[in-house]
């Protein structure tokens, strides 16, 4: 199996293309400071991860900024703090401040020459526009949680994507799902019968960061530590 075997790359955005962990850590600082305690970045990411996914399951039709507001409330309660309205609103709308990884734009611009590029993201359409402006390419298809009515790892999100691409003439065997999160992406991609590439952004770090702990270790067909590494591997594959 080679990277050149596929026609479409379907991407998770946050954690894969956008550095949501930096964004989340920064956005949680005001609330964290009010505890009077010192948290490591991983501790902040873990409290986010164990509150975000349950909230998405409870309110699958909510816009992502409303998910973030609810996550803020859950974390404040966990820490024994009263919510602050201004903090809550800033956290809820913090996606606009989340940066792209340094290698993302160059890698996407290269890969765009060889594949259809597709987004499958736990976000709403308006929030994704803010991130899309940082990614440097025009995606061929954009599928959000708002479009589907649920959040990954719900299998409906993958069924929706596979069906949408089939209508565009792209068969499931021609799709390479490309993502960081084992929980949100690789387990349901396995279950959907998709080939997948793991962008292991947390290589060298312990734990799962801002993502929920996966129930099992899924199969991944390719593994790269960055999007830049994936683009370079494609160049080498072309050389044979």
Curated annotation (Swiss-Prot):
Could you give the subunit structure recorded for this chain? Monomer.
Which Gene Ontology terms describe the biological processes this protein takes part in? response to toxic substance
CC annotations in GO: periplasmic space
CDD domains per record: HAD_L2-DEX (cd02588)
Question: Does the keyword Transmembrane helix belong to this entry?
Answer: no
Protein name in the entry:
L-azetidine-2-carboxylate hydrolase
The record's EC number reads: 3.5.-.-
Q: Give the enzyme class.
A: hydrolase
Taking the first listed entry, what is the main subcellular location of this protein, grouped into a coarse class?
A: periplasm
Q: Which keywords fit this entry according to its UniProt record?
A: Detoxification, Hydrolase, Periplasm
Q: Which residues form the active site?
A: 12 (nucleophile)
Q: Which SUPFAM superfamilies match?
A: HAD-like
Catalytic reactions on record: (S)-azetidine-2-carboxylate + H2O = 2-hydroxy-4-aminobutanoate
Compartment annotation: Periplasm
């Amino acid at each position: 199996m080679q990277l050149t075997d596929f026609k479409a790359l379907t991407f998770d955005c946050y954690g894969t293309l956008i550095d949501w962990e930096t964004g989340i850590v920064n956005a949680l600082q005001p609330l964290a400071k009010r505890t009077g305690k010192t948290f490591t970045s991983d501790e902040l990411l873990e409290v986010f991860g164990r509150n975000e996914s349950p909230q998405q399951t409870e309110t699958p039709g909510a816009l992502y900024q409303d998910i973030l507001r609810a996550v803020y409330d859950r974390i404040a309660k966990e820490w024994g703090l009263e919510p602050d309205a201004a903090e809550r609103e800033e956290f809820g709308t913090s996606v606009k401040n989340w940066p792209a990884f340094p290698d993302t734009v160059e890698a996407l611009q290269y890969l765009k020459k060889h594949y259809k590029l597709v987004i499958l993201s736990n976000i709403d359409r308006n929030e994704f526009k803010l991130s899309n402006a940082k990614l440097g390419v025009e995606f061929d298809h954009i599928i959000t949680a708002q479009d589907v009515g649920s959040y990954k790892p719900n299998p409906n999100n993958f069924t929706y994507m596979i069906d949408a691409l089939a209508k565009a003439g792209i068969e499931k065997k021609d799709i390479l799902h490309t993502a960081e999160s084992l929980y949100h992406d690789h387990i349901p991609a396995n279950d959907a019968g998709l080939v997948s590439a793991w962008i292991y952004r947390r290589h060298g770090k312990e734990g799962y960061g801002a993502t929920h702990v996966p129930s099992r270790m899924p199969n991944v067909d390719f593994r790269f530590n960055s999007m830049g590494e994936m683009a370079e591997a494609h160049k080498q594959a072309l050389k044979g």
